[in-house]
């Protein structure tokens, strides 16, 4: 799959922007703060329903506007598809596919992308929340129905936490809360699906991770990934950090029916502590995935270069998995200011690894940071305007310049 045309309205610093895109590699180049990342951020939003830079959608709406619009013309095997999302500042977002309204959470069914960014280093060195988000985004791209499961879990968790906080405030004991039993069952039923799906995903990623790491690093350091489950811990810590001893090793849980009894027992075991804290202490919202190199946790032991290689390998492995499973072609690869973070050797190896994908979109502040064969088609961005872009004769819509709406 490729993006033939991207159109933005009141998105970030663009009042309006239109750009026609080519198969293969396209480089968006411009000084920092000009708006080049905003273009690829918009495409990332279409496939993940979120931004890699901010946690709230409101930040994506141009200052002074009430909504932003992202439109993309997609093409696969000669067929075209138009997808659109309207991001509203004070109302629910809205989506369309070929002019027909659809649920926003259905968009990943039609378009998938994998984004590489400087923030990816936090996948190795950062908190568990980033690794959970990585897995969940990939789950939804592979199996779009899981977007509903994840939303249902968030709602059940919120309701259960509200009940626990109320019980703590009123000094109620565990045997006085029959309503909590209902929410326990719901949390276990939904959460077990997520735990099993993540476990199966990590298992599928493992061989791709090994190949991708070798391709990027040029050496085999035995990269591995293993789920770490809070339902297996006797005493989940407040810092939400995986147990490096393996006490929380959840690699064997890839089926929902295997997770349910263990989750049920953990909920019962932790109820007294949860009533003390007013908080749900076990479940997929407290889990992690442990990355290892040469048998040691990458977090805390891997060098800066090894950490970067692992982060890039995780994203490449994700892309290969989507490519293998997809019936709509390759995911679009988005490399946002990544080459500036890498040494010359890793730049070359990463460029070689992504060259075979149908479409690769790259941003860079310095033209020379990008290997030459990836920079042939360049889109120049200046002050929130597209000042130069490729104009393929086969493009279905003309490109027109964006307008300056403020730096971003």
UniProtKB/Swiss-Prot annotation:
It is found in: Cytoplasm. Residues 389-402 have a biased composition (Low complexity). GO terms for cellular component: cytoplasm. InterPro entries: DNA-binding_RecF, DNA-binding_RecF_CS, P-loop_NTPase, RecF/RecN/SMC_N, RecF_2. Keywords: ATP-binding, Cytoplasm, DNA damage, DNA repair, DNA replication, DNA-binding, Nucleotide-binding, SOS response. Residues 220-252, 389-408 are annotated as: Disordered. Its main location: cytoplasm. One of its GO terms (biological process) is SOS response. GO terms for molecular function: ATP binding; single-stranded DNA binding. ATP binds at residues 30-37. The RecF protein is involved in DNA metabolism; it is required for DNA replication and normal SOS inducibility. RecF binds preferentially to single-stranded, linear DNA. It also seems to bind ATP. Belongs to the RecF family. This is DNA replication and repair protein RecF. The gene is recF.
């Amino acid at each position: 799959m490729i993006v033939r045309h991207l159109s933005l309205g009141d998105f970030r610093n663009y009042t309006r922007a239109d750009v026609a895109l080519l198969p293969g590699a396209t480089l968006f180049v411009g000084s920092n703060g000009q708006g080049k990342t905003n273009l690829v951020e918009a495409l990332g939003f279409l496939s993940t329903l979120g931004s890699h830079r901010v946690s709230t959608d409101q930040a994506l709406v141009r200052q002074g506007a009430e909504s932003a619009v992202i439109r993309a013309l997609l093409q696969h095997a000669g067929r075209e598809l138009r997808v659109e999302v309207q991001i509203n500042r004070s109302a629910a977002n809205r989506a369309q596919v070929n002019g027909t309204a659809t649920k926003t959470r259905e968009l990943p069914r039609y378009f998938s992308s994998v984004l590489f960014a400087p923030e990816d280093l936090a996948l190795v060195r950062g908190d568990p929340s980033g690794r959970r988000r990585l897995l969940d985004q990939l789950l939804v791209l592979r199996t779009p129905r899981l977007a509903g499961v994840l939303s249902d879990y968030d709602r059940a968790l919120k309701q259960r936490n509200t009940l626990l906080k109320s019980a703590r405030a009123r000094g109620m004991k565990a045997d006085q809360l029959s309503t909590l039993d209902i929410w326990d069952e719901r949390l276990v039923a939904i959460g077990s699906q997520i735990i099993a799906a993540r476990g199966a995903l990590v298992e599928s990623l493992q061989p791709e991770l090994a190949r991708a790491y070798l391709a990027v690093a040029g050496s085999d350091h035995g990269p591995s990934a293993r789920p770490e489950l809070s339902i297996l811990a006797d005493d989940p810590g407040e810092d939400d950090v995986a147990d490096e001893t393996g006490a929380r090793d959840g690699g064997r849980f890839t089926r929902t029916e295997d997770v349910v009894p263990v989750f049920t027992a953990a909920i019962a075991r932790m109820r007294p502590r949860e009533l003390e804290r007013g908080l749900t202490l076990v479940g997929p919202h407290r889990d992690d995935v442990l990355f290892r190199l040469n048998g040691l946790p990458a977090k805390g032991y891997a060098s800066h270069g090894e950490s970067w290689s692992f982060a890039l390998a995780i994203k490449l492995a994700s892309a290969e998995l989507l490519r293998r499973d997809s019936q709509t072609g390759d995911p679009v690869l988005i490399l946002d200011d990544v080459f500036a973070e890498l040494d010359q050797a890793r730049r070359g190896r990463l460029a070689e690894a992504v060259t075979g994908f149908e479409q690769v979109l790259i941003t860079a502040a310095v033209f020379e940071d990008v290997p030459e064969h990836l920079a042939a088609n360049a889109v120049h961005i200046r002050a929130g305007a597209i000042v130069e872009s490729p104009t393929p004769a086969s493009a279905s819509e003309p490109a027109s310049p964006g307008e300056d709406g403020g730096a971003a």
